[in-house]
């Protein structure tokens, strides 16, 4: 004898609801897509929530602000650039010229892999105290590491003792920031993207070590 439970037609499974990770990823993907065509200031929390298929209150469960979304997008770029800088510093004694070029190259390529995100970061520096404080901390770290590098090269007799190492390090890092972002934003005047690494490397090497033969960089 067949029971009712055996003859009952199985109910279809309910479609799985998006997980928290899925919703967060959707917000980030929406931000990346919008940044390709809009300035950061033109994008609202409502835009991000709508694009991710969630409500505005739900958005705030995952991010406290649109600036926090941008920080999440930029974080992997910064980690890649930071790692490249640290590796360059470690290899300085063996081949300082190649190490400096490689550090600049990794830094530029990291942000160049997502130029729209990098441009949004530059824009946020002018409008978001939260983002400005975050970026300032990174710049201070890179400047301090560069100053230590210059000092070490001077102490081992590889570089001349000229202007204060911290002043030189500050100027070089600020130059990198402005030159790279201008290239990524296709600003004029600006250095062409394919020439940025060679140009900055030339300036760094000549500033730290003095005049170098043409083609050394």
Swiss-Prot record:
Regions recorded as binding DNA: 44-63
Q: How is this protein named in the record?
A: HTH-type transcriptional regulator EthR
Q: Which InterPro entries match?
A: EthR_C (IPR049397), Homeodomain-like_sf (IPR009057), HTH-type_TetR-like_transc_reg (IPR050109), HTH_TetR (IPR001647), Tet_transcr_reg_TetR-rel_C_sf (IPR036271)
Locate the HTH tetR-type domain: which residues?
Answer: 21-81
How the protein assembles, per its UniProt entry? Homodimer.
Q: What GO MF terms are annotated?
A: DNA-binding transcription factor activity; transcription cis-regulatory region binding
This molecule's function is given as: Involved in the repression of teh monooxygenase EthA which is responsible of the formation of the active metabolite of ethionamide (ETH).
Q: Quick one: where's region Disordered?
A: 1-22
For whether the record's keyword set contains Repressor, the answer is: yes
Site entry (Inhibitor-binding), positions: 173, 176
Arranged from A to Z, the UniProt key words for this protein are: DNA-binding, Repressor, Transcription, Transcription regulation
Tell me, what is an example of a GO biological process annotation in this record?
A: negative regulation of DNA-templated transcription
